[in-house]
Amino acid sequence: MLDELKCEACSIDAIALTTQQQQELLLELEGWHLMEREGIPQLEKVYKFKNFMQAWQFSNQVAELAEQEFHHPSILLEWGKVTVTWWSHSIKGLHKNDFICAAKCDQIIR
C-alpha cells in the first residue's frame, strides 16, 4: 500500500515517472486525477467538507504530512473544500513520492 511507504529524497537528476507508471499508481488511489499545468504533470484531488473549519483543519494536517515527508504540495483552501495538488518541483514532473503523499492525504480523513 502506498500510504505505508516513506518518501525518498528526490534530487534534480531523479527520473520522472512514465505515463504508464503514473497510470498504474493512479489505480491505487481513489478520486485523484492526473492533470497538466504549464506543461508539468500533476496529481490532484478535491476534498469536500461541511464547513470552513473542517477544511482548514484538514489543510493543517496535510501541511504536517508535507513537513514529515519533506515533500510539499499546493493546497487551495476554500469554504467547504480543499484542493491538494502534488508534483515534484525539482524534476518538473511526477515521482513516486507524489503518489505516496496522495495516499497519505486520503489516510488523514479515514
Curated annotation (Swiss-Prot):
InterPro entries: PCD_sf (IPR036428), Pterin-4-alpha-carb_dehyd (IPR050376), Pterin_deHydtase (IPR001533). It is an enzyme of class 4 (lyase). The keyword Cytoplasm does not apply. Pfam families: Pterin_4a (PF01329). Its EC number is 4.2.1.96. GO terms for biological process: tetrahydrobiopterin biosynthetic process. Keywords: Lyase. It catalyses: (4aS,6R)-4a-hydroxy-L-erythro-5,6,7,8-tetrahydrobiopterin = (6R)-L-erythro-6,7-dihydrobiopterin + H2O. Belongs to the pterin-4-alpha-carbinolamine dehydratase family. This is Putative pterin-4-alpha-carbinolamine dehydratase. It comes from Vibrio vulnificus (strain YJ016).
